[in-house]
UniProtKB/Swiss-Prot annotation:
InterPro entries: Restrct_endonuc-II-like, tRNA_endonuc-like_dom_sf, UPF0102_YraN-like
Pfam families: UPF0102 (PF02021)
Gene3D superfamilies in UniProt: 3.40.1350.10
NCBIfam families according to UniProt: PRK12497.1-3, YraN family protein
Protein name: UPF0102 protein Sfri_0388
Length: 108
């Protein structure tokens, strides 16, 4: 496993410990990708996992671009349409460094 895959696994475990239910991972379309799909009761949570080994250049919290946000939103819309679902949903970010994890809920 590479560091990105390990970070996604760690993020999944962390979110499950917080009471979320795992739905899917690494959902890819030509126009975007979703790292994790979780559920928190009736809310579907699309999670982008960002890992940085240091805080140099702003660390994990500053690693998400507006282009990536657009691509994640498109992928989530497509996923829900393919599943014929229309649930309440939100977009979270798990920002991880070597020594900490930050869970930002509903951040875009």
């Amino acid at each position: 496993m590479n560091s990105g895959q390990l970070a996604e696994q760690h993020a999944r475990t962390y979110l499950e410990q917080q009471g979320l239910t795992f739905v899917d991972a690494n959902v890819r379309y030509p126009f975007g990708e979703i790292d994790l799909i979780m559920r928190q009761q009736d809310v579907w949570v699309f999670v982008e996992v960002k890992f940085r080994s240091s805080n140099q250049f702003g660390g994990a919290l500053n690693a998400l671009t507006s282009k990536q946000i657009t691509r994640i939103r498109l992928a989530a819309e497509h996923y829900l349409q393919r599943q014929k679902l229309n649930p309440p949903c939100r977009f979270d970010v798990i920002a991880m460094n070597i020594d900490e994890i930050n869970w930002l809920q509903g951040c875009f």
